[in-house]
Amino acid sequence: MQITYSKSSDSLVLSPEKASKQKSFESFINKFKSTLETAFHQDNDIDQLSIQRGLPKEVLAKIMSAHPMSLCIPKEYGGRGGTVQENLTLLSAASYESLALSLTIGINSALFLQPVAKYGQENVKMPIFKRFIEEQNMGGLMITEPNYGSDALNMQTSYVEEPDYYHIRGTKHWAGLTGQADFWVLTARKQTLNGNLQRDVDLFVCDNSAPFQKIVVDEYFENLGLYQIPYGRNILDVKIPKLQRLEPKTTGVQMLLDLLHRSRMQFPGIGLGFIKRMLDEAITHTQQRYVGGKNLFSYDQVQEQLSSLQSNYTVCSALCTKSSELADIHNDLMPLGFEANIIKTVSSDLMQKSAQTLLQLVGAIGYKLNHIAGRGIVDSRPFQIFEGANDILYAQISESLIKFMKNVKEINVWEFLKDHPLAQRAVEYLKELLNFNLDYQMPQRKLVELGKAVSRIVSMDLVLKMGENGFRKDLIDGTVSMLHQEISNLMTTFSFKQNTTVVENYEADSSWANLATS
């Protein structure tokens, strides 16, 4: 598969109203891109900024002067009331320049502003949104605790209800924008009279500048990547007014899942801009770098690597399309864990894979924090860990598949997927790989392997659907070929029976030196 250059697509005929809205957004996004160009390339050198902890205040103020946070604030509160498509486009524009900046915007939008817009009490929305628009405030979300990361629903942060406020106590860590955000959505469980904690989780808005709501940063972490985002350990002993409790439609856990699934569906927006940057850097480098009398671009192995980057770009584009279809703030995403987990895992895996590919192509010069290739490795890696570690989510994808199959009393994978709306196009290419009966009692490692394969099958289906809707055909064809190969490899791994376990006290009788001869 040869590397393919992108061309501008034919413009669609829009209604006057849609054309006006599109022009308005184009003006907004172009201003944002221009602001990033000034902040990162004219006034400063982003490669040097990226090796420092945090962004200088003047740089952040310059970026925020373009009002990126206004996009997901509803119009009735002074914001732009942007669509999911527009929000993903904003995240992509930011991640092309800085993954940390894009994540900062994503934290603010998906983990604070959207939950407040959807679940916040009416009397507190306007003051909060006004401060975001006029004072460039920021917000984040605190869930994770020491010993309660993947097991977050058993969090120990608790609250008691008093006549005028909720008293929240606990410890939270690894919340992005620690010590920097002005507002936080806090998660806690209600403490009963006997001291036990209820199973449900409640969410509260904490105004870090208000009396009795100050969160104490106990320690700042030396995070490996994403230098511009502060992380740390936070001590909570705050009193939150009654009006600042988020109001669930059903339960707090379901509200939290709606929030997290919507956030996971924003990952491809962050991923697309980042992957495009990796692709563009790789093409430029390989065209300019000569080895053995010809440029790297002309070597077959390099073409394969560049084509894989282009495939990643195409898959992430398809995931953006699906997210824009599903993730509107008015939709309840709680039941869509299958879709959200696939979108999150695939996009984050492709981000890390793309960074690794670029570094391999660039070579030693890229193994530096002040080079986009090396920085891309450490900045993209945590996306596979936070908001659900990918191996756990892959297992959940398989568990969802098994549940779906049980519901219709089907044990053959191909027979089930050929009628599934998220797989029916792709499985026509894959019958020889999927025509088998599934053992519902498979070990956890096999759940993870199958989940990876299913996520790529759904990705192929989304790519094919995007092709039907007019996306560039040569990119579609190349990506389908790449995905077919990957799915074949994943299914081979899945079919291999292997249950090796760790050998404890392995050092006994395992020294090679004792076996060596002089």
Segments from the language model and where they lie:
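Amphipathic, small/basic residue-rich leader segments at the start of a protein or domain
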Residues: 1-107, 127-134, 431-458, 462-518
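Glycine-rich phosphate/cofactor-binding loops in nucleotide/flavin-utilizing enzymes
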Residues: 2-4, 10, 364-432, 440-443, ...
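C-terminal helix-coil-helix/basic helical segment that borders enzyme active sites and/or dimer interfaces
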Residues: 47-48, 313-346, 359-360
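N-terminal glycine-rich flavin-associated loop
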Residues: 103-123, 149-152, 287
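FAD-binding glycine-rich core of flavoenzymes that anchor FAD
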Residues: 116-146, 161-166
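Short Gly/Pro-enriched turn/cap motifs at secondary-structure boundaries
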Residues: 147-149, 175-176, 223-229
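A short core secondary-structure module
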Residues: 171-215
